[in-house]
């Protein structure tokens, strides 16, 4: 029976409405078979009813009813099969990041690749893809997606998911999404309109804003097999659908079969995570304890820093107060001492002022004399320098005069030679020009006759020239030689005349030069005068010259004599002044030498006496100072020991407070430590006993806490192995009243295992390896077990059981029955109470042990640090005694200092008087010379005359010595010098004229042959030409030589002339300077003799010495005076300052007393004085204490930053003007810490003791939690066992899946199976986890890392060749806790003669690969359903549907196999195939794409399987 139905659509779009023009539905022959649902364990599986496509390309409004098994889409290429499947997949997984339809009409286009093949399958406007499903609860759910193309070049598609529930089964999905607007017209509703329409019909419409929510709804309602929580889950599902759609073996699935087939073992992972979290929590508790310890350290730090902050300021104020009092007393002593010194300085000031006035008057006189001596010395030095220059210049001028005369003669000779050379050169030039002109004429002639004519003309020209120069009109060729000889003789006579005149001229020049020189010397000495009187003046000067020279030679002796007399006179004046000064200072009137010598002896004796007394006092003072230094060293030693001694005393006092004992000697401390060791051993034994008892109770509690009541965990394993139940588990609900009876009834067998068949178990007993010593087995039905198996009689105190015919067992009722849950819970409660009591006792004893240990530790620290000093004498008492002795020595030293000062003053005065006497006594004989002044005047007159002659000789001596040999030349004046000079000039001119005439006549003589030339041959012309050329060359060479000579003589003349000019210039400048120097030395007015400088210098030095001595004395006295005045000012200032300081210090002492009283009152009332008055700090400086306080303040600011009250109190305490605020802050800190003390745990009010007890308690808690951590630690062996069991379970499950694949055959493939193996690297990890290799256990015993990290490190250690990448150890460890990572899954097929092969597309045909791939996918879906069964509703069995496109790749047998597989597994299948598929089963749709006009649509004909039977 087959039903045929047909629906034809023609679609036309007009504006916003879609018009349905034609809808032709053929009548179905019979009513359709109702949609049936198969059952799965009594629960029907959900099914997909239909697929509806609205406004898709070719489908305006088409609903495809889906068969319960196989739905086939048949049609040619481009009929719309892939579009239909794409609509189904889009509604199932509406994720644009995953959708990719490769089989599309837009294949190869860039747009198609961008929209993943979806954009081209839609028409403009709103589109829908809707799935109509019915689940196991018979609920109809429509799920789908609204699609709409987005305008733009990217061809994007917008998707919105929704679901509809509550729609009647009779309602057609197409009618829901369209609205009829005419008889043959309809339009598509948008999403809002659809929502309103659904609500109007009473159904529920829901839109989803995320794909996760959409898939969550589909999973909960049984549409998809697995909950898709993430994009990764959606990707897996899509890959499965894609693999199903395109057929074949998907490498994406086969590579990750573990993720598809093996369920995630969340329970195991959660157990591991819980264990790790418990360990983490325990470690966090330990960290919290460490934090508490750090808080304790913070409190300890707070107490320490607060004590340092306040105690350092407290001691600094105490030191300052004591220092202020001492400073006030010291200021008062200095005040009185300054007043006494002021009185002494005033008397001394008067004496020194009188002496300064006398010294100032004497110094003014000496300064005038000294300045005069300095000026005189400067004049003498200037005169000597001028005289030296004059002498030097006179010598230079004499030398220059001689050189100048010589140079003039040289210049004149050079000039004459130059003129002669130039004349010769000019004559040679004339001859060369003549020869060159003749030669040129010869060369220009065309023939010999022309040359002759030219020579003749030149000869005639030369003859005319000679006539003109010589003035000879009758000159001819015949007489030319005679005239030439005449003129040549005349020229020689003129040359002799010139030479004679030059000789006379040189003699005249020498006489004139000597007369001029002598005349200049006379004028230089006597001044300008006529030349005629020069001889008389020279005679007078030379006559007086010898006597003046003799007188000048006596000048040094006279000057020395005058100097000696003046020096003696200066000594006489100095001696007079020294005597007056001595008498004035000594207040005496001594005049004679005897009186001065007697007084000198008296002063020497006085100095010796005073020196002896001073030496004695110095020795006594040195002894006292040495004693004081010894006392100071002893004081410093005790001062260094004092802080350590005080610290030791404080530590000893704390130990006495903690121990309640009094220690008088170091041996007492050692004895107490020994007793503490004995007490600690006793307490430790008690603590260990209580610990053992607590552990025993914990073990009992742990054993009774088992849920089934088994005391041995091995029994549970055996019960599971034998398939039985523990007897204790069967009687778990027995009442507490019946528990003693049943416990006695079963006796030792109360832990037996109840099994159904003892015979079956008996065979396994021989194979048992690990079991209790006594194992009881009872045969019976665990679901209906009673105690009838035993023959028993109840007595008063027990039960008698007939074990066998010859054996009875009597069991007394136990006092503490443990049979049944109620009895165990009661016993657990009792044990818990007892354990808590034992734990409390253990805690108390442990606390006492810790206390003893801490006390012993404190004593050990005291012994190591302070025992050597704690029992020594008090250093402060010794320091006080030393201070008293030092004060006595200081008083004696002051007395010695005052006496020594007076003696030193007397000694200085005596030494000063003795020094003056030593200077005065050697000069007494000078005072008796009375005629010294007359001798000085006489010597000075003689010296003046001698110095005048000496000056004249010095000024003109050189000139006179030059004048003396040439003075006779002044007798005759050479006046004919100018006449000779003119005559010589005229002779030279005549000589030049005659020489020119001789040259002209010589030229005519040379050309005489030319006059006879008339008809000579060519050879003669050439010979003459050659001669002319040779002559020209000779004359040119001669000219070059003469030119070079002229050039050399010109340069020589220029050089001689330059030297002459330099000498003349030097002579003029030095002569001028000489005259200037002579004038200057005359202006100075002093005599520049040899001894003048020495006398002036000696006089100056003597006056300077006297002035220096006077100035030194005056400077010393003025310094003393200034010192006294400054001391007086300083004393006045000191008096005012000391008075002011005394009053200021007194006011400070009075002002600080008020604040100090408040500090003392606060510290004493709060019992804090002992904590603040730390005597060891008294030895630190104020800066050190302030630095300690500042450092503590900085630490406290950080410590109390979170406590507002303490922070404010600290801020107030920072005011240095109110130290009492620091004490208040100290009290506040202690009060705050007292409030923080838990009085239920710590039995003290003292924060320091509380911190000590807190430390002990925290140590105990740390030990307990460390032990708990060891109990909580995960065993690596247990992890390995869990992993192995889980892997074994999953291997069994895979074997069950393989049973369903055994009979699947496609082509040559006869069977398919899954192969699961454990990876070698992970198998090594499991072996290592089992504990067989102890070297790896260090990782799991390390508390610093988690168990997961330990597993990761172990995996890296046993597999060092594997690169872990950038992943952390925790991530790797978590992966290793997932059993799936231990397994490798592969798919194998049994194919023909090849046997079992790995399932790969390359090894199989297309049909075989499709069938094998479909089998794998079915297995994955089935696995997903089983995996999700726990989290899905129990009344839900999900839909199961797969796809297959292009099914023509399968043969008919494979298609039948596929259909059979779907029927057996209750699965729906949607396949697409060409028209050659026979629709024998399921439902087949024939799709044909047609075009009517400009409209395109798909014609669909549905055919339900004709091979089906009713």
From Swiss-Prot:
Belongs to the SMC family. MukB subfamily. One of its GO terms (cellular component) is nucleoid. It comes from the Bacteria. The hinge domain, which separates the large intramolecular coiled coil regions, allows the homodimerization, forming a V-shaped homodimer. ATP binds at residues 75-82. GO terms for biological process: cell division; chromosome condensation; chromosome segregation; DNA replication. Plays a central role in chromosome condensation, segregation and cell cycle progression. Functions as a homodimer, which is essential for chromosome partition. Involved in negative DNA supercoiling in vivo, and by this means organize and compact chromosomes. May achieve or facilitate chromosome segregation by condensation DNA from both sides of a centrally located replisome during cell division. One of its GO terms (molecular function) is ATP binding. SUPFAM superfamilies: P-loop containing nucleoside triphosphate hydrolases. Keywords: ATP-binding, Cell cycle, Cell division, Chromosome partition, Coiled coil, Cytoplasm, DNA condensation, DNA-binding, Nucleotide-binding. Residues 707-824 are annotated as: Flexible hinge. Homodimerization via its hinge domain. Binds to DNA via its C-terminal region. Interacts, and probably forms a ternary complex, with MukE and MukF via its C-terminal region. The complex formation is stimulated by calcium or magnesium. Interacts with tubulin-related protein FtsZ. It is found in: Cytoplasm, Nucleoid. Its main location: cytoplasm. This is Chromosome partition protein MukB. Residues 346-706, 825-1154, 1248-1304 form a coiled coil. Pfam families: MukB (PF04310), MukB_hinge (PF16330), SbcC_Walker_B (PF13558).
